[in-house]
Amino acid sequence: MKQELIDFLCKKSVNFSDEPSFKLVSGRLSRFYVNCKPTILHPRGMYLVGHLVMEAVKEAKLDGIGGLTFGADPVAMAAAFASELMGCPIKAFSIRKEPKDHGIIKWVEGDMQEGERVAVVDDVVTTGGSTIKAIERARSQGLEVAKAVILVDRQEGGLENVAKLVPDASAIVTRAELLEAWNKLKK
């Protein structure tokens, strides 16, 4: 299943250029860019992501899974849907980038209660900034962040930065795995 996801990502979501031409969230330019949405929002990609994320969190005894909108939303929703299919339902939640300015003011949207154990997910990590922001906001709302799962680790220190806040942090796919598959597909 993992290799199928890697191949799917290479076909739908991975971009390379000879010169650094892709602007990252950090503002830095890169030769390597991954936009996971075309993969995750495809029915087969959603199935693969959901099941692989659930495999990564199955021992954590979680109540919820989510992260910073928009990158984490399809990952969390795929995992929540897969959790129901697997007979171990976990609720999805989304963390706002800006606080809601009306109604009940909160960062976390979804049916989450203070004290519940959650995993924070993200689609891609470079520096870890977005994932760390999600972890901090989840904790500020009283959630216990027990695990962090990243779909694609660019292997630029982000996963290690996340692990400073959540020691049980892992990635489903690494940049090295994508590069290896990309090179095989190009032959």
Swiss-Prot record:
Cofactor(s) needed: Mg(2+)
Biological process annotations from GO: 'de novo' UMP biosynthetic process; pyrimidine nucleobase biosynthetic process
Catalytic activity, as annotated: orotidine 5'-phosphate + diphosphate = orotate + 5-phospho-alpha-D-ribose 1-diphosphate
Positions that bind 5-phospho-alpha-D-ribose 1-diphosphate: 96-97, 100, 102, 122-130
EC number(s) from the headed UniProt entry: 2.4.2.10
Primary enzyme class: transferase
Sections of the chain in a coiled coil: none
A Pfam family this chain is assigned to: Pribosyltran
Cross-referenced Gene3D superfamilies: 3.40.50.2020
Signal peptide limits: none
Residues annotated to bind orotate: 126, 154
Xref: InterPro entries: OPRT, Or_phspho_trans_dom, PRibTrfase_dom, PRTase-like
Record GO terms (molecular function): magnesium ion binding; orotate phosphoribosyltransferase activity
Pathway: Pyrimidine metabolism; UMP biosynthesis via de novo pathway; UMP from orotate: step 1/2
Keyword flag Transferase: yes
NCBIfam families, per database record: pyrE
Function noted in UniProt: Catalyzes the transfer of a ribosyl phosphate group from 5-phosphoribose 1-diphosphate to orotate, leading to the formation of orotidine monophosphate (OMP).
Family label: Belongs to the purine/pyrimidine phosphoribosyltransferase family. PyrE subfamily.
Subunit structure: Homodimer.
Name of this chain's protein: Orotate phosphoribosyltransferase
Source organism (scientific name): Desulfatibacillum aliphaticivorans
This protein's encoding gene: pyrE
